Amino acid sequence: MARIAGVDIPNDKRVVISLTYVYGIGLATSKKILAAAGVSEDIRVKDLTNDQEDAIRREVDAIKVEGDLRREVNLNIKRLMEIGSYRGIRHRRGLPVRGQNTKNNARTRKGKAVAIAGKKK
C-alpha cells in the first residue's frame, strides 16, 4: 500500500479512485492532481513508479488535506459560534444549519426523540 498524506491508499484500485481515500480529495481534485503530476488516471497504484509517487506526493502536499483541513473546518465552526451568528447558534444547539425544516424531521442532527411525561391524555 502506498502512503500519501499519512493515509494508506489501496494498491489494487486505479490511482484516481485511491486518492479519494484522503480526506479533502474528491474525484475532481484527484484528477487535477494527476494531471499536474503527469500521471495517467487509468494506472493502478501498485504499478506506479517511485518518481510518479513522489510527483503525486508533491501535488498533494500543496493542498490542505487530512488533519490540517479538519482543524480548519473545526476552527471555522468555532468562530461562527463565538461571534454568535445564526449559523453558529444552530451549531451550538445541534440543529440543522442550512435552512432545513425541523418541525417533523432533522432526527440525525437533533438526536433520538425523547418522550415527554404526562403529554398523552
From Swiss-Prot:
Belongs to the universal ribosomal protein uS13 family. Part of the 30S ribosomal subunit. Forms a loose heterodimer with protein S19. Forms two bridges to the 50S subunit in the 70S ribosome. Residues 95-121 are annotated as: Disordered. Residues 106-121 have a biased composition (Basic residues). GO terms for molecular function: rRNA binding; structural constituent of ribosome; tRNA binding. InterPro entries: Rbsml_uS13_C, Ribosomal_uS13, Ribosomal_uS13-like_H2TH, Ribosomal_uS13_bac-type, Ribosomal_uS13_CS. It comes from the Bacteria. The lineage of its organism: Bacteria, Bacillati, Bacillota, Bacilli, Lactobacillales. Located at the top of the head of the 30S subunit, it contacts several helices of the 16S rRNA. In the 70S ribosome it contacts the 23S rRNA (bridge B1a) and protein L5 of the 50S subunit (bridge B1b), connecting the 2 subunits; these bridges are implicated in subunit movement. Contacts the tRNAs in the A and P-sites. This is Small ribosomal subunit protein uS13. GO terms for cellular component: cytosol; small ribosomal subunit.
